[in-house]
C-alpha cells in the first residue's frame, strides 16, 4: 500500500514539473483578452481602436455572443 502512495506522489510531481516546463515563448502566447465592453458587441471599431491604443495590432469582438474584446498582436 505504501508503494502505491509513493508511485502516485511521484506521478503527480512529474506532471507538475512537465506542466511548468511547457511555458510558451512570448511569440506563441494567445491573444490578449480584455474585459467586456470597449464597444462590443455592437461597435467592433471601438474594440479595434482600444487595442491599438494599448499597442496591439488590432482587435475584434469574440466570445459566445461577441461580448469580449480580443486583441491580436501580429
Swiss-Prot record:
InterPro entries: Defensin_invertebrate/fungal, Scorpion_toxin-like_sf
Domain of life: Eukaryota
Disulfide topology: 40-61, 47-69, 51-71
Subcellular location: Secreted
Matches recorded under PROSITE patterns: INVERT_DEFENSINS
Keyword annotations of the record: Antibiotic, Antimicrobial, Cleavage on pair of basic residues, Defensin, Disulfide bond, Immunity, Innate immunity, Secreted, Signal
Tissue: Expressed in the hemocytes, fat body and ovaries.
SUPFAM superfamilies: Scorpion toxin-like (SSF57095)
Pfam families with a match to the protein in the record: Defensin_2
Propeptide: 22-34
Signal sequence segment: 1-21
GO biological process: defense response to Gram-negative bacterium; defense response to Gram-positive bacterium; innate immune response
Purpose: Antibacterial peptide mostly active against Gram-positive bacteria.
Family: Belongs to the invertebrate defensin family. Type 2 subfamily.
UniProt protein name: Defensin
Amino acid at each position: 500500500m505504501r508503494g502505491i502512495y509513493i508511485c502516485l506522489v511521484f506521478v503527480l510531481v512529474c506532471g507538475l514539473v512537465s506542466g511548468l516546463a511547457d511555458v510558451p515563448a512570448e511569440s506563441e502566447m494567445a491573444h490578449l483578452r480584455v474585459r467586456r465592453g470597449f464597444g462590443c458587441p455592437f461597435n467592433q471599431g471601438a474594440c479595434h481602436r482600444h487595442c491599438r491604443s494599448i499597442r496591439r495590432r488590432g482587435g475584434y469582438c469574440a466570445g459566445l455572443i461577441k461580448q469580449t474584446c480580443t486583441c491580436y498582436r501580429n
